[in-house]
């Protein structure tokens, strides 16, 4: 069946990740969570909860810093830290989404050294702006097709213009329904 990947960045967050997980559970859908090591260290149980629900857990960063603002050595050390914390939980990521999707000349080389695929997105909810769920859905509908990767957030990363993820939680059910109406199965990255 054709698929659309649902992805969430910047967690786990003790308030918003459980709400996103509950919304996905209610909709009967899975997703991929690109996590921050600094958040995983504070809330490791949320990673286990996501995995228990059938979601994928992948790498975002240890600290949310753009590769444009880092040296290769700093980015490699940041990646090593988040991989170490995930390894301690028994999680072996296969994918890496860099903060803001920004890559440096050396990003893919570091990824290859760790056996990671660098993954971006094709449909951006821009939920960091705090728009209503209906507006976010309207924005991603034109890009909802087989193989699409939808970007949303279960945490409040740097640059967020909102103070919560209520609208992202509210987006899950209509987004899943819209995908299914188009003959797409929403789920984790394959």
Language-model features and meaning:
Residues 65-70, 158-162:
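A short acidic, helix-capping loop that chelates divalent metal ions and anchors anionic groups
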Residues 8-10, 35-38, 59-61, 97-100, ...:
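A cross-domain feature marking catalytic cores of carbohydrate-active enzymes
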Residues 26-27, 41, 162-190:
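C-terminal domain-boundary segment and adjacent tail
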Residues 92, 102, 107-143, 184-190:
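His/Asp/Glu-enriched short active-site or ligand-binding loop at hydrolase and phosphoryl-transfer sites
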Residues 1-66, 74, 78-85, 91, ...:
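Active-site beta->alpha N-cap acidic-glycine motif
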Residues 74-79, 132-138, 165-170:
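Charged helix-capping and loop-helix junction motifs
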